[in-house]
Amino acid sequence: MRESMKSGNFVISLDFEIYWGVRDVLELDQYRDNLLGVRSVIPGLLHLFDKYDINATFATVGLLFFNDKDEMMAGLPEIKPKYTDSHISPYEGHFDQVGRDETEDVFHYAPSLIKMIQQSGQEIGCQTFSHYYCLESGQTIEDFREDLRAAKRIAEKRGITLKSFVFPRNQYNEAYLNVCKEEGISSFRGNETSWLYKAKDADSETLFRRASRLMDAYMNISGHHCHEVTDQDNPGLCNIPASRFLRPYSNRLFFLEKLRLKRITSSMTYAATHGLTYHLWWHPHNFGVNIKENLAFLEKILLHYQKLSKKYVFRSVSMQQLAESLKNEK
């Protein structure tokens, strides 16, 4: 029976950005502990992924690749986005806060961590060059193309070909998909298929939507979000929609941990038994405090994956691996 079942897939993607991903919403001192914790989180994740034979995609902001400030400034795109809200652009004064190199500034550089991920055999994907916001007013599709090309250039300099793409802040913009494909991207992470997760610009987010998503993390409000992954909408570019954001451990909500785990594992089981794909995602900095508790919670998820993989045709694949397997099936 096991051999006759359609294969299900377990996908993990991580939005690797450190301070570039939150610089427009949080002061450095507000989030310092989480960001510093990334230096311990990455080795912890890689250890668990190796232990449970997990393939993951680290969608990395291009600015993290640089070895020093001189290389970074030389690698900036010539054409930069002109957001209506200049505060969200890193090009409007933020580089004055960037230190000389990774030794001096662990918040804006991560070449040693990228090398660690690369050597572990995990996929390094793309989360744009500058944590680019694809739905904000003022920026254009050509700005986006130049940003993506800048990310490709620095990745290629490190021997990495970017094939998988994540929209920063989940600002999914369908109009930009052809640019991704033209620049060599073969898969992207779409948003969950519910009004709760519909892509919006920052000003359109509401407290009700955020509260509803929080409730959905503990109770099945919006469904399992398991998908049959195809490239039918855009041949050659595979949409691998998100299923669940892995929220970090909360000291205030610790009594709901069993519900949070069940919300995830029940959907994983649904994917395994129906030959569908379950896509879990989060940021390494989400695990940056309460590291022990967060990694222990993740290990429970991976143990459940291990059980499912033995009972059903359920495999762990990176975004690139899933896109390649679909291509080979044609």
Task: Please name every model-derived segment.
Residues 1-164, 169-240, 257-279, 287-330:
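Catalytic alpha-helical scaffold of carbohydrate-active enzymes acting on polysaccharides/glycoconjugates
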